[in-house]
């Protein structure tokens, strides 16, 4: 069962479109999560109202529990929230009972029967890189991609970074590693200190990525994507020269599986994807 979260559907519909296209081409039947809400956000929501954060997360998990299905998540923030909430509710019976006393009033029950998986794990462990490769009709012909893992998945599961790398290489891209690839993009500090977030996080990452010769930044996290794209727009207004495409891995996958740029809404990016589109080649 897929959990879209709020940001992908509301702000980055091209990621949702690319995901639907990719899963269909890979022969995966997409099971939607009906009546899902925001995860909610693992930073502001949890800080300002921890009990409410946990209850809302449990409500989302109860939807999957009802069908005994596991949950697959694209957004790193959603992954952190649902993973942490699931662990807390499973480990503390008193907390689980308290949350269920609220959910029961609305005809819902958290049972803890569902596992939470990141889309990286699903594509790598369930579908498999070789199966993905066998379906490709186009390849990235050595496109130099800088991976942005996102701090949230690095905190929850260290195995996800190397799996992400392998998935990128499966598409024919060349990974460009930098010393700041595991540095936070700047989203958490953006709310308290926008200047620090822009110049001490986003700009630091962008300078190193540019110096390393990367042609694009690829990631899964919609918050990272939004931050790094917006940062480049702001920095250009300050006289800096940043124009590095920021693209979700699922968009790259869809393009390599045969989607046209217009079909997935590639034109909606603030930083044009032209350098990527020019490098895509038909597979032999």
Regions found by a protein language model. Give the residues of each.
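Iron-sulfur cluster-binding electron-transfer modules in prokaryotic oxidoreductases
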Residues: 1-284
């Amino acid at each position: 069962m897929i959990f879209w979260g709020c940001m992908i559907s509301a702000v980055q519909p091209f990621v949702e479109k690319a995901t639907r296209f990719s899963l269909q081409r890979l022969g995966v039947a997409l099971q939607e999560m009906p009546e899902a809400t925001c995860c909610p956000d693992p930073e502001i929501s949890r800080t300002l109202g921890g009990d409410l954060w946990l209850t809302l997360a449990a409500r989302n998990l109860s939807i999957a529990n009802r069908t005994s299905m596991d949950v697959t998540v694209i957004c790193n923030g959603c992954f952190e929230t649902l993973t942490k909430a699931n662990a807390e509710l499973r480990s503390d019976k008193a907390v689980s009972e308290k949350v269920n006393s609220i959910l029961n009033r609305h005809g819902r029950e958290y049972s803890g029967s569902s596992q939470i998986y990141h889309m990286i794990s699903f594509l790598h462990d369930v579908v498999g890189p070789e199966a993905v490769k066998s379906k490709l009709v186009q390849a990235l012909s050595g496109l130099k991609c800088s991976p942005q893992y996102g701090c949230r998945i690095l905190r929850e599961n260290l195995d996800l970074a190397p799996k992400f790398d392998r998935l990128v290489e499966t598409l024919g891209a060349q990974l460009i590693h930098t010393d700041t690839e595991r540095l936070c993009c700047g989203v958490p500090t953006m709310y308290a200190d926008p200047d620090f977030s822009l110049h001490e996080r986003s700009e630091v990452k962008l300078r190193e990525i540019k110096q390393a010769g990367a042609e694009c930044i690829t990631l899964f996290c919609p918050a990272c994507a939004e931050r790094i794209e917006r940062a480049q727009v702001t920095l250009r207004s300050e006289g800096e020269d940043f124009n590095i495409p920021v693209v979700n891995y699922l968009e790259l996958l869809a393009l390599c599986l045969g989607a046209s740029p217009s079909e997935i809404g590639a034109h909606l990016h603030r930083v044009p994807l032209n350098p990527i589109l020019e490098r895509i080649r038909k597979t032999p």
